[in-house]
Amino acid sequence: MSDDGRQPRRDSQRAKVYDGEQLVRGVFDRAAEFGHRTVDIYGSQVTLPVERRFASVESVQSYVDKVLALNWVRGQWARAGVPVRVRARAGSSAAHYEVAEAVLAVPLHTGVSAWALRELVVLHELAHHLAPTAGEAPHGPEFCTRYIELVDGVIGPEAALLIRATFGGCGVRFG
């Protein structure tokens, strides 16, 4: 049961969202690796912005604080006024958001990889934080729309277009 006493809806889009995000991260990784930032998205040539990477929990915390302090974020989502604490997470499987304590947990470096210390992952977790009620599906249409709005306003419209098109190709619904 959720904090407000309601049952959260079934998370039927979770696998589709994660599949789409993995594809998007791959596009950003290749753009960074090879220096070719222009990609074709369903016939449109788009130059991807640079995705920020983080070195530590402290740098993620600073970024989260700055995103939540943006005027347009505070104006759009009441929960932007609720501070988020960032902590390291054991293991390397996933980042996650803990609703009850407003905690964003990110796995740090595992070997040579720090896959979760990146802007797209942090914005995904912030989209969970900004949910107005605990009754919505964790990766449902409302979440996906909120995530894309964050990406659009923080990283840029080109990144948001890539996510929207990729999610659409994976069968993700928006609301």
Locate predicted features.
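Active-site-proximal or metal-binding-adjacent scaffold patches in catalytic folds
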Residues: 1-120, 129-175
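Walker B catalytic acidic pair
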Residues: 125
